[in-house]
Amino acid sequence: MSTENTLSVADLARENVRNLVPYQSARRLGGNGDVWLNANEFPTAVEFQLTQQTLNRYPECQPKAVIENYAQYAGVKPEQVLVSRGADEGIELVIRAFCEPGKDAILYCPPTYGMYSVSAETLGVERRTVPALENWQLDLQGISDNLDGTKVVFVCSPNNPTGQLINPQDLRTLLELTRGKAIVVADEAYIEFCPQATLTGWLVEYPHLVILRTLSKAFALAGLRCGFTLANEEVINLLLKVIAPYPLSTPVADIAAQALSPQGINAMRDRVAQTVQERQYLVNALQQTACVEHVFDSETNYILARFTASSSVFKSLWDQGIILRDQNKQPSLSGCLRITVGTRQENQRVIDALRAEPV
């Protein structure tokens, strides 16, 4: 049989997938460290006991206990909540539900979380960027100029990796600019560290507002892969049309419901208080470290800092088993490294290693 016209497996793939650069998650980048401060995880494990043993049956698409517990915690109605495999799936669901490949676009404001771009590219949806201003706030004029053909605008607040909140008045202006034109997705993955800044109370005013949440950060359940989308019922019903039939396994739903119990939420708030205390300790120490040029304000469980020689610092700590997140390739973040707030022992190891660096 002739093989002249036979395509390779790669040739059979969609062109945009062949050209896709996958998201470089902390785990994908690897490393052989014993101090992992590169993925904004909680530094110690939380223990749960599995109570659901009926693993021979398929789980509910939207487990009732999880939905009701999260709705009560977030101060919304159960009909306004969708649970998914992490907030990353929520990003993809919104794009799939609202964007026509080859026709519509998403918009985001770098430097910010990389999965908005990767999800859109995977789905064949155009990506538009409006870089943040020098203070990392929204360029509202730039966004306004790019709304024609844009169906979804992603805003991360507090923003990853910079750590700051987006000005609430700017968010209101954005929601007014996009009313009747586009969905606005507010990524609140880190909102537990600044709960006063949540936009959940705005859902009644803005039918096109969507909020993303996760159990990966303050709830210390990054390995669970459980996230939430909060929106008005009309939006949730559209997302339910495109979600997989069984997004959460029975053990995941079991643990998530426990984490969202009154006891679980109290434990989360204790972890937040502990993290905020350690964050201030780390900020103070970094500000007194010679190789650190600037420490940026943070409303999260991580700190962004600019270094005099970030590449050599990153490699030096990597070689010592201290794994940070290099942000040099992000727009306007030259010389910056992101440091997750760890335990006191981990934070001290970072400081000791940095103070041993040549200046």
Curated annotation (Swiss-Prot):
It holds the Pfam family Aminotran_1_2. Its EC number is 2.6.1.9. The keyword Electron transport does not apply. It comes from Salmonella dublin (strain CT_02021853). Gene3D superfamilies: Aspartate Aminotransferase, domain 1 (3.90.1150.10), Type I PLP-dependent aspartate aminotransferase-like (Major domain) (3.40.640.10). It comes from the Bacteria. Pathway: Amino-acid biosynthesis; L-histidine biosynthesis; L-histidine from 5-phospho-alpha-D-ribose 1-diphosphate: step 7/9. One of its GO terms (molecular function) is pyridoxal phosphate binding. The modification N6-(pyridoxal phosphate)lysine is found at residue 217. Its cofactor is pyridoxal 5'-phosphate. The lineage of its organism: Bacteria, Pseudomonadati, Pseudomonadota, Gammaproteobacteria, Enterobacterales. PROSITE patterns: AA_TRANSFER_CLASS_2. InterPro entries: Aminotrans_II_pyridoxalP_BS, Aminotransferase_I/II_large, HisP_aminotrans, PyrdxlP-dep_Trfase, PyrdxlP-dep_Trfase_major, PyrdxlP-dep_Trfase_small. One of its GO terms (biological process) is L-histidine biosynthetic process. Homodimer. Keywords: Amino-acid biosynthesis, Aminotransferase, Histidine biosynthesis, Pyridoxal phosphate, Transferase. Belongs to the class-II pyridoxal-phosphate-dependent aminotransferase family. Histidinol-phosphate aminotransferase subfamily. The keyword Transport does not apply. Disulfide bonds: none annotated. It catalyses: L-histidinol phosphate + 2-oxoglutarate = 3-(imidazol-4-yl)-2-oxopropyl phosphate + L-glutamate. This is Histidinol-phosphate aminotransferase.
